Amino acid sequence: MPSHPNRGPKGPTANPAPAEVRAAREAAGLSQTAAAALIHCTLRGWQEWEAGNRRMHPAFWELFRIKVAS
């Protein structure tokens, strides 16, 4: 159960699925290293999100989407 009503698979800023993270990065034409640097996280953290070993926090996902859109 999510600890907050806006988190989880159905909230407005839901945690993205690993495949969604990878697809967004590839669509932006970024390497994992560049994507991690773009949102100020570690390369290992980004790799964990894409592998499905950790869930990406909605704030990181939103920041990534904003930065690649501009």
Report each predicted region and the residues it spans.
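N-terminal flexible/basic segments that precede or flank functional cores
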Residues: 1-15, 63-66
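Charged, low-complexity surface patches
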Residues: 14, 25, 53
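Alpha-helix N-cap/N′ positions at the starts of helices
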Residues: 16-17, 41
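Short basic helix-loop element that most often maps to the first helix and adjoining turn
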Residues: 19-34, 63
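Short alpha-helical DNA-recognition segment
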Residues: 29-47
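DNA major-groove recognition helix of helix-turn-helix/homeodomain DNA-binding modules
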Residues: 40, 54-70
